[in-house]
Amino acid sequence: MREYKLVVLGSGGVGKSALTVQFVQGIFVEKYDPTIEDSYRKQVEVDCQQCMLEILDTAGTEQFTAMRDLYMKNGQGFALVYSITAQSTFNDLQDLREQILRVKDTEDVPMILVGNKCDLEDERVVGKEQGQNLARQWCNCAFLESSAKSKINVNEIFYDLVRQINRKTPVEKKKPKKKSCLLL
């Protein structure tokens, strides 16, 4: 079974832990202590293939920056999350993406831009078009709006990253060994 190392990044309070826990455990937790770093494992089936996802739920971008290079180096796919209710969380993502590309030393990094808390439409300050435009600027990066609370597009975030990783590094099908018979 193939393993995937996925990293959830973004400013504090955007709902990184809520999205991760909703995906892994199927529950929405209203109150959290700020995350330092949590790791979760979940086996899923994506496109008829069993996958083991290791998801790293990280601290907000403004905290524990020393650890960030390490999990960027080890991660295979990245969810960059902002809250549609806070413009500053959206603005923070450009630097975060640039740091990922610098650490990975490539532009071709499986990544998805996630506008979280789309259930709070009446508190929206970041328009959907802003997210779509930023994703286009980022070499047509994948983009979704989500809600951990309302279970909107939660699974899709992680499944999309798995598909991107598979496109970048396809699973090699094991060829059956040819059996040979030697007659003496």
Curated annotation (Swiss-Prot):
GO annotations of cellular component type: anchoring junction; cell junction; cytoplasm; cytosol; early endosome; endosome membrane; extracellular exosome; glutamatergic synapse
Positions contributing to GTP binding: 10-18, 29-35, 60, 116-119
EC numbers on record: 3.6.5.2
Modified-residue entries (Cysteine methyl ester), positions: C181
Residue positions of covalent lipid attachment, annotated as S-geranylgeranyl cysteine: C181
Membrane topology: Lipid-anchor
Membership in a protein family: Belongs to the small GTPase superfamily. Ras family.
Residue numbers covered by motif Effector region: 32-40
Catalytic activity, reaction form: GTP + H2O = GDP + phosphate + H(+)
Ribosomal protein in keyword set: no
One Pfam entry name: Ras
Keywords, in A-Z order: Cell junction, Cell membrane, Cytoplasm, Endosome, GTP-binding, Hydrolase, Lipoprotein, Membrane, Methylation, Neurogenesis, Nucleotide-binding, Prenylation, Tumor suppressor
Protein name as annotated: Ras-related protein Rap-1A
Propeptide: 182-184
PROSITE patterns: RAS
Native species: Homo sapiens (Human)
SUPFAM superfamilies documented for this protein: P-loop containing nucleoside triphosphate hydrolases
Annotated GO MF terms: G protein activity; GDP binding; GTP binding; GTPase activity; guanyl-nucleotide exchange factor activity; protein-containing complex binding; small GTPase binding
Regulation: Activated by guanine nucleotide-exchange factors (GEF) EPAC and EPAC2 in a cAMP-dependent manner, and GFR.
Chief place of localization: membrane
Subcellular location: Cell membrane; Cytoplasm; Cytoplasm, Perinuclear region; Cell junction
InterPro entries noted in UniProt: P-loop_NTPase, Rap1, Small_GTP-bd, Small_GTPase, Small_GTPase_Ras-type
Function summary: Counteracts the mitogenic function of Ras, at least partly because it can interact with Ras GAPs and RAF in a competitive manner. Together with ITGB1BP1, regulates KRIT1 localization to microtubules and membranes. Plays a role in nerve growth factor (NGF)-induced neurite outgrowth. Plays a role in the regulation of embryonic blood vessel formation. Involved in the establishment of basal endothelial barrier function. Facilitates the progressive accumulation of CDH1 at mature desmosome junctions via cAMP-dependent signaling and its interaction with PKP3.
